[in-house]
Amino acid sequence: MSMRTEYCGLVTEHLLGQTVSLCGWVHRRRDHGGVIFIDLRDREGLVQVVCDPDRAEMFAAAEGVRNEFCIQVKGLVRGRPEGTINAGLKSGRIEVLCHELNVLNASVTPPFQLDDDNLSETTRLTHRVLDLRRPQMQHNLRLRYRVAIEARKYLDEQGFIDIETPMLTKSTPEGARDYLVPSRVNAGQFFALPQSPQLFKQLLMVANFDRYYQITKCFRDEDLRADRQPEFTQIDCETSFLGEQEIRDLFEDMIRHIFKTTIDVELDATFPVMPYSEAMARFGSDKPDLRVKLEFTELTDAMKDVDFKVFSTPANTKDGRVAALRVPKGGELTRGDIDGYTEFVRIYGAKGLAWIKVNERAKGRDGLQSPIVKNLHDASIAAILERTGAQDGDIIFFAADRAKVVNDSLGALRLKIGHSEFGKANGLVEAGWKPLWVVDFPMFEYDDEEARYVAAHHPFTSPKDEHLEYLETDPGRCLAKAYDMVLNGWEIGGGSVRIHREEVQSKVFRALKIGPEEAQAKFGFLLDALQYGAPPHGGIAFGLDRIVTMMAGADSIRDVIAFPKTQRAQCLLTQAPSPVDERQLRELHIRLRQPEQPKA
């Protein structure tokens, strides 16, 4: 008989009366009046093994096993006695009567029980191998595998070719920091780990491969958040001779296919499309969570002439904004709730949180409860009530500051209230999946510190055809042929139509204050390639980690990556990064300089 004939979790009634050989880990061992029960676990689940003292040698071995011992069991599949069936297990109607038990490897006492749901992330990542044995982690990584498989199936059917691009490449710092790799044979020179395969996939389009994809690692040396890692995985795609709409349609179908085949979710037949400007105006975010039924009301123009300086000053400032957020039935929020929200928005730079409770709208000013009503004229109050559509029992929150502060703070408040218990109880948030495309992004953003425009996405994104003239006259007006796929408030994919003409790419570099010499030094290989009849092309990259995180309902992408880094970009399992031997540094022609200590 083979060492293993079946997986534990797949032993069901179809094997009744058969002898099986199972291998796995002791999940639990229970001694019930001389009979030992072992819950044996492998990647497919659990099966109950019964060890009877009639077989002395086997029973002696069973007495010695403990949690996480790796064992082999041979025995007879039989039905469980009446009253002992476990409907929660696939194997819950049967058990295996053990004939032979072999300890393949003993285990020291584990630092935690695998079913302990209150472990710190530090403990889990330090003992990641054990953590990965937990059923939820097994589920997450198998889900990740299925998502990757379905992406490959779809792309293969659509004529895409899987082509690997280099991991050691040229540093072109335009955005996040590169991870640098010193070259031993080229002293003083460095490779960079790719932030994306962007330029190589464009070169593949010039090289006539027409449709490319790869599921690949990317690297960015940036501060980490719950949805970021220094190394992450993209489903990276590029195609020639398709316009923006055709590209969006192609990859919208791919995401629908992946969700249907992996978690049996039917996404919308057509994803709504929203311009960036509309998303910012209505939700304060370029990745709006459409499950939350709250929207901003624009008040900037209506607050220009009020005496209340908190509103009028930003309303008359070039980059200022005044916006309101009406919360239906929010009148029941307590002062403690409001104070909590006030402290919350301070995280995003807001100086405070103005509010008005609408008790009886028909009474005008007298029907309102608020510390700011006394500072507003009747006409201003009427404008607020009219524009927000406030009803009796509502509360209106206000943000007035620089547009970025207003968008960030009121946008975060919108999500916090919507997803709160109050929001759920009052129908302010829907369940399910709400995808959309956000399009028509600004081509450039102005960097005050550098006193120049920087690329909002990357400098290889094509401007909209009607905005080409702005590249040289007014770059700030230029919109890009860029598009992001957003799902439940997460950007799961982003892409664009690329620049395929060398003269347009050179104009973009000039708008970014990248001179001809610098452009040639950093991107000469791309500019040269574009001169050889480069086709119109575009593409998209999806964050595999993010997609799987959402599907799994996980709190962090670290829960869907086998061996992730912490928020300090460290691996607690291997203790990477770590010091290296002085000899290695000498071979690389590198001398370390100790970081300067902050002055007391």
UniProtKB/Swiss-Prot annotation:
Identify the enzyme class. Answer: ligase
Q: Where is this region: Aspartate?
A: 198-201
UniProtKB keywords: Aminoacyl-tRNA synthetase, ATP-binding, Cytoplasm, Ligase, Nucleotide-binding, Protein biosynthesis
The entry's ATP-binding residues are R220, D221, E222, Q229, E491, G543, L544, D545, R546
Q: Name one GO cellular component term.
A: cytoplasm
Cell compartments where the protein resides = Cytoplasm
Q: Which SUPFAM superfamilies match?
A: Class II aaRS and biotin synthetases (SSF55681), GAD domain-like (SSF55261), Nucleic acid-binding proteins (SSF50249)
InterPro entries (alphabetical)? Aa-tRNA-synt_II, aa-tRNA-synth_II, aa-tRNA-synth_II/BPL/LPL, Asp-tRNA-ligase_1, Asp-tRNA-ligase_1_N, Asp/Asn-tRNA-synth_IIb, AspRS_core, GAD-like_sf
Q: Name one GO biological process term.
A: aspartyl-tRNA aminoacylation
Question: Location of site Important for tRNA non-discrimination?
Answer: H32, G83
Task: Report which reactions are catalysed by this protein.
Answer: tRNA(Asx) + L-aspartate + ATP = L-aspartyl-tRNA(Asx) + AMP + diphosphate
Where primarily located?
cytoplasm
What is the annotated quaternary arrangement, including any partners? Homodimer.
Query: What protein does this entry describe?
Result: Aspartate--tRNA(Asp/Asn) ligase
Q: Which organism is it from?
A: Burkholderia pseudomallei (strain 668)
Q: What is the lineage of its organism?
A: Bacteria, Pseudomonadati, Pseudomonadota, Betaproteobacteria, Burkholderiales
What gene is this protein translated from?
aspS
